[in-house]
From Swiss-Prot:
The lineage of its organism: Bacteria, Pseudomonadati, Thermodesulfobacteriota, Syntrophobacteria, Syntrophobacterales. Belongs to the IPP transferase family. Residues 65-68, 189-193 are annotated as: Interaction with substrate tRNA. Catalyzes the transfer of a dimethylallyl group onto the adenine at position 37 in tRNAs that read codons beginning with uridine, leading to the formation of N6-(dimethylallyl)adenosine (i(6)A). This is tRNA dimethylallyltransferase.
Amino acid sequence: MNDTTAKTLNCSPASRDGFPETLGDFGRTRVDLPVVLVAGPTGVGKTAFAVELARALGSEIVNADSMQVYRHMDIGTAKPTPRERSAVPHHLIDIVDPDEPFDAGDYLARARPVIATLHEAGKVPIVVGGTGLYLKVLTRGICAGAPGDPDVRRRLIEEELTLGLPALHERLRDVDPPLGARIHPNDRQRILRALEVFHHSGKPLSYWQRQHRFEDAPYRTLKIFLHRPREVLYARINDRVDAMMAQGFLDEVRNLLAMGCGPELKPMQSLGYRQMARHLRGEMSLDEAVNEIRRDTRRYAKRQLTWFRADPEYRWFDAADTHGLVARIVRETPDLHDNRLR
């Protein structure tokens, strides 16, 4: 690595629409192992940008989307197309079946060795996804002390069906006020996880999080967040849902149900799959299911924006000019290519 990259990342909110310094000034740590993180809300265009960047840098992509790890769930998770995956090697896609437990700890255990292998090969890993928790544990470690229990989780899911998610969120606010205030009332997975930890351990998840000491950053990271104007993003989300339906999303869910993937499985409770399964069970019309997917996807995108706004290390860029951004990365970060890691 050359000495021009030794400055510490300094990204203030006012600088998020562009670089306050050169790209070569991204954060250096004790361990000089560069990683590019590409985040953004669902539908913004992360995959296309990451493929273009990986080709320009002669690198490979590491998935950081919590749903793309599952086999047989392709359309609803918007996995990279066969053409994109043939253009650039992708890692951590299709690695577990829908009935296999998989969480942030499992992701960390899988991702770190892949990144190490790419570094050994002289390549800069490009980690891509919108799952903020996966990106966070990759760079900061994980709160491993918070215990969970599958039986408690199943009981909570049953309560959700009878009482509704708002009632569970209100309970969370009672038993864990700090976390209940931070978690959005529609953030189903985090509500269930927090209540699971509380009912199993007798202590709120915020207690376990306070016990965790974040590790020193193991990588030198360039954190890129792609965004678009809200009306543009929402239009892209609506178009994506329409495209999913045209590609056979309903049949994909029907096949998963035929394979024995019931509503109790975490992947089947996710956005899109939950609504299609409810339609197939006769609980809502197809139009109702599609409209709910559109609405909930827009809400999910809004939560993603809120999550990443809280991390000042991400540099925000309009996804409409990804070609220019790739060219700038290549021009201003010479240590990220030309086999400089060898």
